[in-house]
Amino acid sequence: MSSSHTVTVSMDVEAGQKNKDKKGISQDLILAYKTLGVVFGGLVTSPLYVYPSMNLTNPTEEDYLGIYSIMFWTLTLIGVVKYICIALNADDHGEGGTFAMYSLLCQHANIGILPSKKIYTEEENLISNQPVVAGRPGRLRRFIESSIIARRLLLLTAILGMCMLIGDGILTPAISVLSAIDGLRGPFPSVSKPAVEGLSAAILVGLFLLQKYGTSKVSFMFSPIMAAWTFATPVIGVYSIWRYYPGIFKAMSPHYIVRFFMTNQTRGWQLLGGTVLCITGAEAMFADLGHFSKRSIQIAFMSSIYPSLVLTYAGQTAYLINNVDDFSDGFYKFVPRPVYWPMFIIATLAAIVASQSLISATFSVIKQSVVLDYFPRVKVVHTSKDKEGEVYSPETNYMLMLLCVGVILGFGDGKDIGNAFGVVVILVMLITTILLTLVMLIIWGTHVVLVALYLVPFLLLEATYVSAVCTKILRGGWVPFAVSVALAAVMFGWYYGRQRKTEYEAANKVTLERLGELLSGPGLRRVPGLCFFYSNRQDGGWLTPVLAHYIRNMRSLHEVTVFLTLRYLLVAKVDGKDRVQAVRRLGPAGVYGCTIQYGYADAIDFEEDDIAGQVVGALRERVVDGEEEGERVEAARAAGVVHVRGKMRFHVGKDTRLFDRVLLGFYELLHGACRSALPALGIPLQQRVEIGMLYKA
């Protein structure tokens, strides 16, 4: 009887595991289909503009074979080996991108700049879902931990990587849509350039207006379009290979690259600024990881995107070998006339989709940096109940829209944008290589020989590309570079202002003894209700100086007051059981403290999460002595909840040193324009109170 029962249970467990695996596979396949409409748009539509962006002069068959060989190995090494096989494994709880890798490093080594970036339980034990390699901190880790300069350089590198991804996001939509719509001018030469520009701008405006409905809804509409594109272009490529140059795949031999550079020398090096466009968009599949999953991106890339690009570029090159001067319209000229208009429609729709990958990636990295307090607060909306990494930012969306339209109207031609394109893309890839190397050494504990086998070839490849694209800066490449630098300046200005506020709070702290004196002062009243008083710091038994300012001027404090510290962590998500921590009594009657912890990918909504209920429950469970005190806490909550937050501002006077006057003045400008913290936490309007306080810089 017992044996039969054991067999039945075992079979049930196995059946359950199989069902779970089937469900996981089917979910990955569905997500893989959706990635076509979001992640790979920029990469898979690159055949529209790669050859037209090259400044070729009297190209020969050998030149085209060398160019195809370069593109094939670039796609294989950077796309397959670097991103699909290695980088996607360096995720932070499902989140990708340069900033996610930086946060991952901060979790496993003491290299972060801002405080309060670890998850603590009640016993203050560090929680990590990533394995730490014991006994292998290495000299590199110790050096970075001990050097403030190295730590700041690492932070700056991560910030630049994020900003350059956004700079890339400005050009991708513009060049994709312009290159597609430019196909009208082939059969209809009378169509003017301003008409193409206006139509392209109108299409992009429509795309940006769709973003508020969420990535899932947008990708569900866009995935069929990209599926048609990834099927149609390689089919035409195979036809072109068969008709024009069946031996094109001999160019997969790397010796054609050597011959290309031996023949063209400096000119060949300059042409790398065009061939690099074949991999633009690959960086988005890592940054968009939070919107999907690692396996879904790997499935889609290896089964669809990579074969499609290899065959499409092979077909284009085969056509151009027989029509050497058609490179300036290298895509539409290689499309057979009977299918020209169907391909024009698909290309236009695919170009619209291509814009989505960088838009989604931009939303992800902005959300990460806002939560970690490296960027001014902008509104971030979670557009999916099932996928927490799927977000939308209205301010970011409309700023991108204006910049994209400005690029179209400013450059006016896809070929001119091609000169500007690729500068920041390859820099993002180089930064990814550097951060990934640190992840291998510090977190994964990879043997130094294997790390060298990764680092040396990719560093040489990407550094060579960087040297080539730098020649394009004066021909328009300065635009995305300038946007990236401007964003980095915003982040540094914000970070500097936050650091100065932290220093001021430490110098003007309110100790628990001082709190007792303030509460025992004459004329102070305790009013009914539960008050959450937001304090940036509770470390070492002291509170924010805004508290003393509040008590001195209001002459009152709520009957039950909880000093609440929000801790935004360098981890993607915090488990619900670790949300409310460090609950304790702070001395005077009815005064408590606690910490609320969130990861940068968590959806934050105090009302929906019932934070007030969680804190009251934690107080009754861990702190409150006796039924009477517990009833007092519950009665205070029933009387009304209020959230009080100090809004400390810098007063920049004439006697302030010039450096601080510039940076803190810039910070105040940003601070005045950004959103308040309380609405971002999902706190109802009637429960919000903000107390202003000036600090002389």
Swiss-Prot record:
Residues 51-66, 174-189, 239-271, 322-338, 412-422, 469-475 are extracellular. Keywords: Glycoprotein, Ion transport, Membrane, Potassium, Potassium transport, Transmembrane, Transmembrane helix, Transport. GO terms for biological process: potassium ion transport. The keyword Chaperone does not apply. Residues 1-29, 88-152, 211-217, 293-300, 360-390, 444-447, 497-697 are cytoplasmic. GO terms for molecular function: potassium ion transmembrane transporter activity. Its main location: membrane. It is a multi-pass membrane protein. Signal peptide: none annotated. High-affinity potassium transporter. The chain crosses the membrane at residues 30-50, 67-87, 153-173, 190-210, 218-238, 272-292, 301-321, 339-359, 391-411, 423-443, 448-468, 476-496. GO terms for cellular component: membrane. It comes from Oryza sativa subsp. japonica (Rice). It is found in: Membrane. Belongs to the HAK/KUP transporter (TC 2.A.72.3) family. Glycans are attached at residues 55, 264. Pfam families: K_trans (PF02705), K_trans_C (PF22776). This is Probable potassium transporter 4. The gene is HAK4. The keyword Transmembrane helix applies.
